[in-house]
Amino acid sequence: MKKIFAVLGDPIEHSLSPIMHNSAFEALDMDCTYHAFRVEKNDLENALQGAKAMGFGGLNLTVPLKETALKFVDADSLAAKIGAINTIDFKDGIKGYNTDGIGAKRTIEDEGVDIKDKNVLILGAGGAARAIAFTFAEAGANVNIANRTPERAMQLAAEIGDAKGYGLDIVDNGLEDIDILINTTTVGLGNSNGTLVTAEQMHSDLAVFDIVYNPLMTKLLQEAETAGARPITGIMMLVYQGAEAFRIWTGKEPPINVMKKTVMETLDI
């Protein structure tokens, strides 16, 4: 019997998860299918119980359901710290995970950049920043967070423990002591062509990762190129967070190259 997987959210029409996961199932000749369903916050508990009752293999969650889901699932320790769920597995109850930070970590490691003991500066203090900050702290990075509202950055840093929070003006002094710069804000998304950091503030040993993947080469990454730094695009974070969910659900090694090719073709990159 065909196993069903899905992503839930509102809005959901934009999601690339169905085409990415269906390409993976097809590549491994698995009798599975992946769909997208619009689910509002107030309906999430019923949706989770319904999916479990109908024998779904697993779910992904996107905006605005990630935080709400904590009330209804058995979250693993990392997801509980992050305070958000993006992956649900039904093999043993309703288990919740967060693979966003893992997606970012694998993307950067793919570029040959080791995270342990590195000084990381994360721009933003929202959901993606939380996932990346906690995951990188667990991996042994020295985490720094800069946010438009410094209090939010300091609050997140305090939750992590061994981290520091600042206002965005921290970048004005230059990034000589930073090894990895990560943008988790929406600055640079779409046609905005904005950046929070310029080439003059960077150095050539810096790795610059932007989780925005549309456009692929954001203004921030263009500035990184100008500075002779290493630009890392956000597209593989999307692929790797999905690949980790695939691994959790199926126990199989996901076909990363197939998933990447499908996403890039869909985005016409």
From Swiss-Prot:
Pathway: Metabolic intermediate biosynthesis; chorismate biosynthesis; chorismate from D-erythrose 4-phosphate and phosphoenolpyruvate: step 4/7. NADP(+) binds at residues 124-128, 147-152, 211, 234. It comes from the Archaea. Shikimate binds at residues 15-17, 62, 86, 100, 213. Keywords: Amino-acid biosynthesis, Aromatic amino acid biosynthesis, NADP, Oxidoreductase. Belongs to the shikimate dehydrogenase family. This is Shikimate dehydrogenase (NADP(+)). It comes from Methanococcoides burtonii (strain DSM 6242 / NBRC 107633 / OCM 468 / ACE-M). The gene is aroE.
